Amino acid sequence: MFSFNKSEHLCGETQINRLFAEGKAFIVYPVRVVYMFKSEDIPTIKVLVSVPKKKFKRAVARNRLKRLMRESYRLNKTSLLAFCSEKQLSLQIAFCYVGNESADFQTIESKIKIALEKIIQAESK
């Protein structure tokens, strides 16, 4: 339940390009969220985490932010999993860090929680 396996990672250039071209987006600063629902028999959630090299030159800083975003998603994904399995939907999400400064875990976790709730509310309508 609290795992984040390779099968949950969004991979493949075509899938990523389609997500950014056709997906809906919003910002919960410092995270930009792009998501796209598809109706499928087997509901799955695929996640992409991104931190720009332009703003964070050092790989250590980028990797830390990606690790924090992955961890906060992993801990708070249960409501999203329940929603997708109930509605028989597949979901692709991209979390892109847009802040200029590095944030702590509490900040990122609260913003990811808000983002996941927004995704559920948007599709519930």
Predicted regions and their residues:
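Positively charged, solvent-exposed patches that mediate nucleic-acid binding
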Residues: 1-125
